[in-house]
Amino acid sequence: MPRNAHFRFKQFTVRQDQCAMKVCTDACVLGAWADVEDADRILDIGAGTGLLSLMVAQRNTYAMIDAVEIDAEAFYQAGENVEQSPFHDRITLFHSAVQEFVSEHRYDVIITNPPFFQSDLLSPIDKKNIAHHAKSLDFEELLTAIERLLKPEGKFNILFPVDEGSRFAEKAAHAGWKLTRKLTLFHQEDKKAFRLLMRFERAEVAHNVIVEPDLYIYEKDGVTHDPRFRELLKAFYLKF
């Protein structure tokens, strides 16, 4: 996906020149895939450009969405993106670390594309450190925040690189969460998996796990988008 100053979707535009993390395909898949349809209140942890909040607001036309972002420049740009969208009256942004975020409400659903690549070398640029690494939000802190902010029967949807996702799932299980839905994302069929999308619920209220068929962005030619990918993103991507 091109790293342009802005990215146009069917119902909104995401400006991203002030954000370390640009619009990327895997985040778009999370926004289209996450279990949000029946939620009244949704929390987006690590809002970045506001992409996930905007996608969720388009999919769920009545939910109230709170979005938390620690980086000042990303927070202000997300605010501009939200304000210029059709969903500005249902999305509220907070400039805060989620560890310090206090809400009057608990949430039906949490969605997050958290800092990752815990085992990679740190970038020398602080903004990229925040966006790419769990230095600002490790697994335990994230799970503690979710435990505090999610309703007892709530669900959280999360995106990770494959290795990080497997480690996170182990941590979550030890903390009393059950993986109830999983999607493995590939660039194309002959490539290695590169992302895990997961939904968790508290073990005492959880349903049986749904392991969905692998999703490929492209067909084997590496150019043509896979039909299932097109179907998932057709409400958002202009070219679909």
Curated annotation (Swiss-Prot):
Keyword Transit peptide among record annotations: no
InterPro entries: DNA_methylase_N6_adenine_CS, rRNA_Ade_Mease_Trfase_CS, SAM-dependent_MTases_sf, Small_mtfrase_dom, tRNA_Adenine-N(6)_MTase, tRNA_adenine-N6_MeTrfase
Pfam family, one: MTS
Taxonomic superkingdom: Bacteria
Reactions accelerated catalytically: adenosine(37) in tRNA1(Val) + S-adenosyl-L-methionine = N(6)-methyladenosine(37) in tRNA1(Val) + S-adenosyl-L-homocysteine + H(+)
GO biological process: tRNA processing
Places the protein is found: Cytoplasm
GO cellular component assignments: cytoplasm
The protein's enzyme class: transferase
Alphabetic keyword roster: Cytoplasm, Methyltransferase, S-adenosyl-L-methionine, Transferase, tRNA processing
One GO MF term attached to the UniProt entry: nucleic acid binding
EC number: 2.1.1.223
Function as written in the Swiss-Prot or TrEMBL entry: Specifically methylates the adenine in position 37 of tRNA(1)(Val) (anticodon cmo5UAC).
UniProt similarity note: Belongs to the methyltransferase superfamily. tRNA (adenine-N(6)-)-methyltransferase family.
PANTHER family for this protein: TRNA1(VAL) (ADENINE(37)-N6)-METHYLTRANSFERASE
Name used for this protein in its record: tRNA1(Val) (adenine(37)-N6)-methyltransferase
